[in-house]
């Protein structure tokens, strides 16, 4: 049984733990014991994961970013009267370090100079969730960052410390991006009418 793409929050998507994602498959290939442990243990996002989520939200759901995030003022001191007042007004938001404001500006300039800017130039949808009850005997899911309306183009944004061809090639192997790409293509082949051309 195949499900058509669904619109849901990131939290709802990750809450569907009966379905395997590319992340869980990569864990199985790396360490089956860690995979089984993570299935039952409470997940605590690392700082890198939280920053990655912020970057994705900035580029893909900018209005949501404005509602959920804020930047800590430079030379912030939470012990002062002004600092305490600022925390009272912004404590309900996800607070990013002051330098992240400038980082995102530089990232945006780089992004607009890359092929990934197609997400602004072509019709498509962000953060759609795809589910399959039987992907080779596995309940599967995937959530591409962006997919074109004709399903011919899929974009998944990645942050990296080294954007050179050699540096990013190393990241591909280190983080299993090639496995993720294959998983996404297979999921979309099963769940999207136009995905034959994509895969």
Annotate each language-model stretch with its function.
Residues 59-64, 159-162, 189:
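Hydrophobic/aromatic-lined pockets within catalytic cores
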Residues 190-199:
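Single conserved hydrophobic/aromatic residue that forms the stacking wall/gate
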Residues 178-187:
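An active-site-proximal "capping" alpha-helix that borders the catalytic cofactor pocket
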Residues 1-142:
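Metal-dependent nuclease catalytic cores that hydrolyze phosphodiester bonds in DNA/RNA
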Residues 168-175:
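Short, contiguous acidic/charged loop-to-helix segments that flank catalytic cores in large enzymes
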Residues 116-120, 148-154, 188-190:
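Secondary-structure boundary elements
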Residues 144-167:
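Conserved catalytic cores of phosphodiester-cleaving nucleases, focusing on short active-site segments
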């Amino acid at each position: 049984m195949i499900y058509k793409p669904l619109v849901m929050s990131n939290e709802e998507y990750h809450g569907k733990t009966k379905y395997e994602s590319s992340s869980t498959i990569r864990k199985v290939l790396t360490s089956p014991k860690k995979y089984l442990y993570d299935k039952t243990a409470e997940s605590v996002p690392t700082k890198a994961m939280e920053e990655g989520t912020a970057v994705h939200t900035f580029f893909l759901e900018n209005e949501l970013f404005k509602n959920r995030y804020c930047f800590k003022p430079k030379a912030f001191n939470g012990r002062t009267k002004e600092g305490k007042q600022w925390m009272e007004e912004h404590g309900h938001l996800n607070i990013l370090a002051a330098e992240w404001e400038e980082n995102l500006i530089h990232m945006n300039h780089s992004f607009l100079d890359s092929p990934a800017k197609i997400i602004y130039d072509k019709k498509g949808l962000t953060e759609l969730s795809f589910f399959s009850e039987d992907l080779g005997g596995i309940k599967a899911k995937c959530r591409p960052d962006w997919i074109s309306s004709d399903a011919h183009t899929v974009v998944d944004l990645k942050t990296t410390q080294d954007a050179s061809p050699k540096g990013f090639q190393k990241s591909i192997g280190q983080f299993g991006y090639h496995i993720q790409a294959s998983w996404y293509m297979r999921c979309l082949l099963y769940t999207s009418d136009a995905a034959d051309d994509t895969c």
